[in-house]
Amino acid sequence: MLQDSITGIVNSFNLFFPSTMSRPTLMPTCVAFCSILFLTLATGCQAFPKVERRETAQEYAEKEQSQKMNTDDQENISFAPKYMLQQMSSEAPMVLSEGPSEIPLIKVFSVNKESHLPGAGLLHPTSPGVYSSSEPVVSASEQEPGPSLLERMSSEHSLSKVMLTVAVSSPASLNPDQEGPYNSLSTQPIVAAVTDVTHGSLDYLDNQLFAAKSQEAVSLGNSPSSSINTKEPEIIKADAAMGTTVVPGVDSTGDMEPDRERPSEMAADDGQSTTTKYLVTIPNNFLTTEPTAGSILGDAKVTVSVSTAGPVSSIFNEEWDDTKFESISRGRPPEPGDNAETQMRTKPPHGTYESFEGTEESPSSTAVLKVAPGHLGGEPALGTALVTALGDERSPVLTHQISFTPMSLAEDPEVSTMKLFPSAGGFRASTQGDRTQLSSETAFSTSQYESVPQQEAGNVLKDITQERKMATQAMNTTSPVVTQEHMATIEVPRGSGEPEEGMPSLSPVPAEVADAELSRRGESLATPASTTVVPLSLKLTSSMEDLMDTITGPSEEFIPVLGSPMAPPAMTVEAPTISSALPSEGRTSPSISRPNTAASYGLEQLESEEVEDDEDEEDEEDEEEEEEDEEDEEDEEDKETDSLYKDFDGDTEPPGFTLPGITSQEPDIRSGSMDLLEVATYQVPETIEWEQQNQGLVRSWMEKLKDKAGYMSGMLVPVGVGIAGALFILGALYSIKVMNRRRRNGFKRHKRKQREFNSMQDRVMLLADSSEDEF
């Protein structure tokens, strides 16, 4: 067929160009044309086998993936009645993981559409959990483990489950040929990758790296690439900004089979997916122990905290929309090995979620994570990350809790970093003007054995003091731990301030806050740290109007620190002390208006007394300021009159602004000459008096100019002469130029006239010659 086409083309060339083109020029043209045609056909033929090969590989991958997912779905769905799986609304992205109460879960993470942090969520229950998802959520693993890895590792050690979740966005089920109970979750597809690792590898996790490196694709080393469907838009796009998540205890390159390509190469083929990702960095002293229910309640190193925050109405910008919503949890990006905190961003969730024990709760319920501390002595474990769903209200609350042992205050001060308790430097940076930025930890519960019961949406400050009192009695008296509990969360609008820089940690004996200008007086009280809970209660409404700060002492007196009503809004920070000898001074930066909500224990009386004292002080200050202003005005008037008199001291005639027609400076009012004043007001002024006054004014103005100008006044004459000389030189140069131009033009004109005259003479002579010749 190819030869026939080539011969036909050659014959057509011979027919069209038999005479015009010679054979030496025809042959190279035909050869070039045929080679181009042959190359196009050859590339097309080579492309067909590749397409067929790709389609067969894709079909094989789909079949294998459907088989694996059916087996995993049977295992996961079998636990669904136990944990009461409940689907979420498809509008808000959220991944919720649950387990038994004695199993430490590591992360509950949610994904914001706007955030572009690459990342992953790692879960470590001892039994498989139930996962549900909607909208793009990306986790550590993209694929399912290979059977060779399962066989190799199951033959050596006893198995424990490490759940690695992957949720991808798709309006329908992941594969249309899936069977069984998985089709009931077709609107929220999810792939649960179950990797069997050894129990010994959990201890090995302490020294391994769990980090995120940019400029590589997300890959879990020993996962086969055949389980990825490269044609469907659910597969995650592996671009340069995506981070690599290396799971500890699993070699990412050693167990890779040679006939399988890397998952990142397969994922790179997809250019359609736009999913948002999270980076969850886990400290390296983390996944070590698995406490039982008894050890959770009895061991001093394990903290169980269940807390909920009431709904807080969000504060938005004027140009707010869904793409610009930003929660309070704004801070520095998480770093590898960070023991102090975990940063998360959340999109407002909708719908209901599962509680910690698996029972269905209201939309304001919470999903709580319990974490066992690490093996490293004295170092604390990362606390609880808690995501509160506030129903249809678009204001999520992120709660970070930091648990630590009594040893940790002295050994690792970075753990007790409370970003609402800075020392003098950070406090000054965060409270000047409107530049108030709340850190990502909006609620803390660092008590060792406390468990705050879940509250409804309306409870804000009523029952907190009783719970604090009970928690104080139940706390161990030998552990000097500063406890900050249930601080009301505050929503800060986007762009209202700059992020706080360098929040220092709370040392075992904190320094006194040195900002004396922020408060008129500080209330000091001694607090024994072994048995006293020193809370910091903040309530800030959506319009930033009400701000109240109280300190609870041993006698349980509330000492409010109030600000003036006209000052800009700022945060109120209390610095509690641990030692009983050091007093605690309350420093407040003023708020917009006085609080209209009062707590218990006679707060209204104290507040009214404070208000009266403040009003008295303000009145006294106002009177003093008015007196000072009057004195300043009198001084200025005296100075003006003195200067006028000085100007006219040299004048023999009556000086100053006397009325026209009156010769004396002071009219004789005492003698009853009021008629003279009335006549003087209508008298035409004499010219001599006006001239004298004008001369005095001009003389005073000249003296003032000389005094102010100083030595510059003596330079006016030479500067003027220099400027005049420069202008004269420029004028002379210009005039010379103009004269030369005129001379040149005149010379040209003269030449032109002479040439014309010569030509006329030549013409006349030629005519004469020609006429002579004719005759």
Curated annotation (Swiss-Prot):
<feature type="compositionally biased region" description="Basic and acidic residues">
    <location>
        <begin position="324"/>
        <end position="335"/>
    </location>
</feature>
<keyword id="KW-0597">Phosphoprotein</keyword>
<keyword id="KW-0732">Signal</keyword>
<feature type="glycosylation site" description="N-linked (GlcNAc...) asparagine">
    <location>
        <position position="476"/>
    </location>
</feature>
<feature type="compositionally biased region" description="Polar residues">
    <location>
        <begin position="129"/>
        <end position="142"/>
    </location>
</feature>
<feature type="glycosylation site" description="N-linked (GlcNAc...) asparagine">
    <location>
        <position position="76"/>
    </location>
</feature>
<keyword id="KW-0812">Transmembrane</keyword>
<keyword id="KW-0472">Membrane</keyword>
<dbReference type="InterPro" id="IPR031524">
    <property type="entry name" value="ARMH4"/>
</dbReference>
<dbReference type="GO" id="GO:0050727">
    <property type="term" value="P:regulation of inflammatory response"/>
</dbReference>
<dbReference type="GO" id="GO:1904841">
    <property type="term" value="F:TORC2 complex binding"/>
</dbReference>
<dbReference type="GO" id="GO:0016020">
    <property type="term" value="C:membrane"/>
</dbReference>
<feature type="modified residue" description="Phosphoserine">
    <location>
        <position position="771"/>
    </location>
</feature>
<feature type="topological domain" description="Cytoplasmic">
    <location>
        <begin position="737"/>
        <end position="775"/>
    </location>
</feature>
<feature type="region of interest" description="Disordered">
    <location>
        <begin position="324"/>
        <end position="366"/>
    </location>
</feature>
<feature type="modified residue" description="Phosphoserine">
    <location>
        <position position="770"/>
    </location>
</feature>
<comment type="function">
    <text>May modulate immune response and may play a role in inflammation. Down-modulates STAT3 signaling throught direct interaction with IL6ST, resulting in the inhibition of phosphorylation of STAT3 at 'Tyr-705'. May negatively regulates AKT signaling by modulating the activity of mTORC2 complex through RICTOR interaction.</text>
</comment>
<protein>
    <recommendedName>
        <fullName>Armadillo-like helical domain-containing protein 4</fullName>
    </recommendedName>
</protein>
<feature type="compositionally biased region" description="Acidic residues">
    <location>
        <begin position="606"/>
        <end position="640"/>
    </location>
</feature>
<feature type="region of interest" description="Disordered">
    <location>
        <begin position="120"/>
        <end position="148"/>
    </location>
</feature>
<feature type="compositionally biased region" description="Polar residues">
    <location>
        <begin position="577"/>
        <end position="599"/>
    </location>
</feature>
<dbReference type="Pfam" id="PF15767">
    <property type="entry name" value="ARMH4"/>
</dbReference>
<feature type="signal peptide">
    <location>
        <begin position="1"/>
        <end position="47"/>
    </location>
</feature>
<feature type="transmembrane region" description="Helical">
    <location>
        <begin position="716"/>
        <end position="736"/>
    </location>
</feature>
<comment type="subunit">
    <text>Interacts with IL6ST; this interaction prevents IL6ST protein homodimerization and bridges ARMH4 with IL6R and STAT3 and therefore inhibits phosphorylation of STAT3 at 'Tyr-705'. Interacts (via cytoplasmic tail) with RICTOR; this interaction bridges ARMH4 to the mTORC2 complex and inhibits the mTORC2 kinase activity.</text>
</comment>
<dbReference type="GO" id="GO:1903939">
    <property type="term" value="P:regulation of TORC2 signaling"/>
</dbReference>
<feature type="topological domain" description="Extracellular">
    <location>
        <begin position="48"/>
        <end position="715"/>
    </location>
</feature>
<feature type="region of interest" description="Disordered">
    <location>
        <begin position="247"/>
        <end position="273"/>
    </location>
</feature>
<keyword id="KW-1133">Transmembrane helix</keyword>
<keyword id="KW-0325">Glycoprotein</keyword>
<feature type="region of interest" description="Disordered">
    <location>
        <begin position="559"/>
        <end position="669"/>
    </location>
</feature>
